[in-house]
């Protein structure tokens, strides 16, 4: 049996925080605002995985009202989510992710992001795709006020 999940997330860019995307810290003058480390890409991946097994979203599992998750490492959250998927007997088919950001440029970090996501999903890097695009300076991402990400995952019974 195959199942598909889709994830989407957005975080505001602010001064005074590190920029962590796909489990990789990216040198930039701003970082993403959030209760956890605000890793927009890993949140998206986790949401896609939870959706594929009908387990809601990361807000249900890691509420931003719970102090336990303050500044949480999103990679650890993803590993927990993947544990739920595995417990239900699924393995990764593949995942395709898109980062939507005007700045900074993501290309130098894409391969490291792919490797980190593959590690979190206990998969081969060939099963993980990450790409980035801009909105041609339109909207909040185009004005570099925030970063968005989306992902689609295919899982199958192992």
UniProtKB/Swiss-Prot annotation:
InterPro entries with a match to the protein in the record: MECDP_synthase, MECDP_synthase_CS, MECDP_synthase_sf
In the UniProt record, does the keyword ATP-binding occur? no
* Pathway, per record: Isoprenoid biosynthesis; isopentenyl diphosphate biosynthesis via DXP pathway; isopentenyl diphosphate from 1-deoxy-D-xylulose 5-phosphate: step 4/6
Q: Quick one: which residues bind a divalent metal cation? A: 9, 11, 43
* Catalytic activity as recorded in UniProt: 4-CDP-2-C-methyl-D-erythritol 2-phosphate = 2-C-methyl-D-erythritol 2,4-cyclic diphosphate + CMP
Q: Keywords of this protein's UniProt record, alphabetized?
A: Isoprene biosynthesis, Lyase, Metal-binding
One GO molecular-function entry? metal ion binding
User: What PROSITE patterns does the database record attribute to this sequence?
Assistant: ISPF
Q: Which residues bind 4-CDP-2-C-methyl-D-erythritol 2-phosphate?
A: 9-11, 35-36, 57-59, 62-66, 101-107, 133-136, 140, 143
Q: Does the keyword Lyase apply?
A: yes
Q: Which cofactor does it need?
A: a divalent metal cation
Q: How does it assemble?
A: Homotrimer.
Q: Which PANTHER family match?
A: 2-C-METHYL-D-ERYTHRITOL 2,4-CYCLODIPHOSPHATE SYNTHASE, CHLOROPLASTIC (PTHR43181:SF1)
Summarizing the function annotation, the protein's role is:
Involved in the biosynthesis of isopentenyl diphosphate (IPP) and dimethylallyl diphosphate (DMAPP), two major building blocks of isoprenoid compounds. Catalyzes the conversion of 4-diphosphocytidyl-2-C-methyl-D-erythritol 2-phosphate (CDP-ME2P) to 2-C-methyl-D-erythritol 2,4-cyclodiphosphate (ME-CPP) with a corresponding release of cytidine 5-monophosphate (CMP).
Full protein name: 2-C-methyl-D-erythritol 2,4-cyclodiphosphate synthase
Gene behind this protein: ispF
């Amino acid at each position: 049996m195959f199942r598909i999940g889709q994830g989407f997330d957005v975080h505001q860019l602010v001064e005074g925080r590190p920029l962590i995307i796909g489990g990789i810290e990216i040198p930039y003058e701003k970082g993403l605002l959030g209760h956890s480390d605000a890793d927009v890409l890993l949140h998206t991946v986790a949401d896609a995985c939870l959706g594929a097994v009908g387990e809601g979203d990361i807000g249900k599992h890691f509420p931003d009202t719970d102090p336990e998750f303050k500044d949480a490492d999103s990679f650890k959250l993803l590993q927990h989510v993947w544990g739920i998927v595995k417990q239900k007997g699924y393995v990764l088919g593949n995942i395709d992710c898109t980062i939507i950001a005007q700045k900074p440029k993501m290309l130098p970090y894409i391969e490291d992001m792919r490797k980190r996501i593959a590690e979190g999903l206990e998969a081969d890097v060939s099963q993980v795709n990450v790409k980035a695009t801009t909105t041609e300076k339109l909207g909040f991402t185009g004005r570099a006020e925030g970063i968005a990400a989306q992902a689609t995952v295919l899982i199958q019974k192992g």
